[in-house]
Amino acid sequence: ALKKSPEMEPGILFTERQFGLLELHSSDLSMIEDTGNAILHGIGAKAEDQLAPKILFHDIIENISDQHSIILNRSRDASILTPGVSLLIYEMQPALFACVAANEAEKVAPNAIVNDIQMMGASGRIFMSGSTEDMQKAKDAITQILSNVKGRPS
């Protein structure tokens, strides 16, 4: 795919037995779509062959304490969780749908802070913080977008 579109920029190549990931970047959306179609053609698949997302868990924790924020921030380099905000935790399968979900959540809650996106492996997680109202909007947007993705049942 990259031979046909050398101006595409590779972002991530993560290999795993069952759930690998190839991330490509371009400012031209049609080039992204054409490259995606070339990859699917190359492996003899179509978009509908993907696994449909499955929602595993979601919750909004209101008014995070300082102790909780310290524990959750231990492995963070940026976008730290601050005491007093609400925290949205959303888990789904396959993991890569966490990227789609986070993108939709940011559209409806632009003031929210994306604290972490775990997008590799079998299950993915999003940790977002902000006002309770924004976290509810984000949760609803994620649920809607994941429910509308076509794919085969897992």
Where on the chain are the PLM-derived regions?
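Short, glycine/polar-rich helix-capping loops at beta-to-alpha or helix-loop-helix junctions
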Residues: I113-N115
